[in-house]
C-alpha cells in the first residue's frame, strides 16, 4: 500500500470546513462572548445589507447574498479586541474562509472602490448606528469623537468618502434615494421585496 503524506503547512492542502449558515454564525458569536448589543447591531447590519442585495438584484446586479449575510453577521466578531476588523479578518483567514475574511477586514475601510460583497456590508454598517437606521453624515459625526490622532481622523475621513461614493453608486444603479427612515431593525426572517421597499424612497 502506498503511503500518503499530508502536510498541513502545504498551501495546497485545505482543511474541510462547514458552511457558514446563520446557526453557525450565531454559535461563533456566542463562543467569543460577543455582547448582546453588538450582536443586535450585527443583525441590523445584516438585514440592511440583504435589503441592498435584493434591491440591486431587482435591477439586474447580482451578488452572493449568502456571502453578504454571513459576512455581515460576523463583521464585528472580534469587537472586543483592538483593531477588531483586522483581527477578525485574520481569524477567518486562518479558519479557511478567505472571502469572509475580506468582508470582515474591510468593514472599517475598503481596499478598492469596487461595488462588491465587502462594499455592501461596509455601507450597511455605516448606515446603522447600534440598531437604528441613520444617515451616513450622522453616523460619522457621532463617531468623530473617537478619533484621537491625526491618523485616526484621516482614516475616518477616508471611510466617510468611501461610504458617500458607494451610496451614490447604489442610488444611481437602483434609481432610489436611501432614506434614514428612523427604522429600528430587529432579527427575523428575510423580508420580501415589497417589504424591502419600505426602507427606500423610490
Specify the residue positions occupied by each region the protein language model found.
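A short small-residue
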Residues: 23-32
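Amphipathic alpha-helical interface surfaces
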Residues: 84-88, 100, 116-119, 136
Amino acid at each position: 500500500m502506498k503511503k500518503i503524506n499530508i502536510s498541513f503547512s502545504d498551501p495546497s492542502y485545505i482543511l474541510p470546513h462547514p458552511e457558514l449558515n446563520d446557526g453557525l454564525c450565531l454559535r461563533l458569536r456566542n463562543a467569543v462572548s460577543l455582547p448582546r448589543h453588538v450582536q443586535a447591531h450585527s443583525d441590523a447590519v445584516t438585514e440592511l445589507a440583504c435589503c441592498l442585495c435584493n434591491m440591486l438584484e431587482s435591477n439586474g446586479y447580482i451578488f452572493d447574498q449568502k456571502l453578504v449575510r454571513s459576512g455581515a453577521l460576523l463583521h464585528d466578531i472580534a469587537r472586543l479586541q483592538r483593531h477588531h476588523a483586522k483581527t477578525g479578518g485574520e481569524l477567518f483567514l486562518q479558519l479557511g474562509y478567505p472571502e469572509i475574511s475580506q468582508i470582515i477586514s474591510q468593514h472599517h475601510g475598503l481596499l478598492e472602490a469596487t461595488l462588491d460583497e465587502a462594499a455592501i456590508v461596509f455601507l450597511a454598517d455605516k448606515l446603522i448606528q447600534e440598531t437604528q437606521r441613520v444617515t451616513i453624515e450622522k453616523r460619522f459625526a457621532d463617531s468623530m469623537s473617537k478619533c484621537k490622532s491625526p491618523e485616526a481622523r484621516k482614516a475616518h475621513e477616508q471611510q466617510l468618502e468611501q461610504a458617500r461614493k458607494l451610496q451614490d453608486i447604489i442610488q444611481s444603479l437602483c434609481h432610489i434615494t436611501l432614506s434614514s427612515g428612523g427604522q429600528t431593525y430587529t432579527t427575523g426572517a428575510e423580508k420580501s421585496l415589497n417589504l424591502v421597499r419600505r426602507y427606500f424612497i423610490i
